[in-house]
């Protein structure tokens, strides 16, 4: 059975896209060290990212931008991204395994697996692709807006990030539907 593993990164941050990734692994090319991306060092994630994109049978990465997140809400934006991942790889898999407890509204043979990124290697691989891709976007945001410190906090609502929004203002990359950003917009 050919498995498509799907996971996302970036539901909690105040800025940047939510990213979903899907991976179909090549059973003949073993990638050692696959695990939940949150449990790996940045260096290990980068190394595994390169191995995954080189050796996977297929993969895709989808971004939903902050404006769409604001229009849909983060759950619907995440489900939309996951749906697009499956559509991008349609007819290449027998079953979809998604990290978490919710599935998009689709007709694919699928299962949501809580903590799937720690249990299923295809989901672990997707977790790594989504996290590294999103972190790279945050590094680009840091180059564009160095005063905000995106390389450090990756868009999460840290004290530093909130202080920098207050000091320098809300950017287009911020999610305006998120309460901390709304509060700062209304000050």
Swiss-Prot record:
<feature type="binding site">
    <location>
        <position position="99"/>
    </location>
    <ligand>
        <name>a divalent metal cation</name>
    </ligand>
</feature>
<dbReference type="GO" id="GO:0032299">
    <property type="term" value="C:ribonuclease H2 complex"/>
</dbReference>
<dbReference type="GO" id="GO:0005737">
    <property type="term" value="C:cytoplasm"/>
</dbReference>
<dbReference type="GO" id="GO:0043137">
    <property type="term" value="P:DNA replication, removal of RNA primer"/>
</dbReference>
<keyword id="KW-0378">Hydrolase</keyword>
<keyword id="KW-0963">Cytoplasm</keyword>
<comment type="function">
    <text>Endonuclease that specifically degrades the RNA of RNA-DNA hybrids.</text>
</comment>
<comment type="similarity">
    <text>Belongs to the RNase HII family.</text>
</comment>
<dbReference type="InterPro" id="IPR022898">
    <property type="entry name" value="RNase_HII"/>
</dbReference>
<keyword id="KW-0479">Metal-binding</keyword>
<dbReference type="InterPro" id="IPR024567">
    <property type="entry name" value="RNase_HII/HIII_dom"/>
</dbReference>
<feature type="binding site">
    <location>
        <position position="7"/>
    </location>
    <ligand>
        <name>a divalent metal cation</name>
    </ligand>
</feature>
<dbReference type="Pfam" id="PF01351">
    <property type="entry name" value="RNase_HII"/>
</dbReference>
<dbReference type="GO" id="GO:0003723">
    <property type="term" value="F:RNA binding"/>
</dbReference>
<keyword id="KW-0464">Manganese</keyword>
<dbReference type="InterPro" id="IPR012337">
    <property type="entry name" value="RNaseH-like_sf"/>
</dbReference>
<protein>
    <recommendedName>
        <fullName>Ribonuclease HII</fullName>
        <ecNumber>3.1.26.4</ecNumber>
    </recommendedName>
</protein>
<feature type="domain" description="RNase H type-2">
    <location>
        <begin position="1"/>
        <end position="187"/>
    </location>
</feature>
<dbReference type="GO" id="GO:0030145">
    <property type="term" value="F:manganese ion binding"/>
</dbReference>
<dbReference type="InterPro" id="IPR001352">
    <property type="entry name" value="RNase_HII/HIII"/>
</dbReference>
<keyword id="KW-0255">Endonuclease</keyword>
<feature type="binding site">
    <location>
        <position position="8"/>
    </location>
    <ligand>
        <name>a divalent metal cation</name>
    </ligand>
</feature>
<dbReference type="InterPro" id="IPR036397">
    <property type="entry name" value="RNaseH_sf"/>
</dbReference>
<dbReference type="GO" id="GO:0004523">
    <property type="term" value="F:RNA-DNA hybrid ribonuclease activity"/>
</dbReference>
<keyword id="KW-0540">Nuclease</keyword>
<dbReference type="GO" id="GO:0006298">
    <property type="term" value="P:mismatch repair"/>
</dbReference>
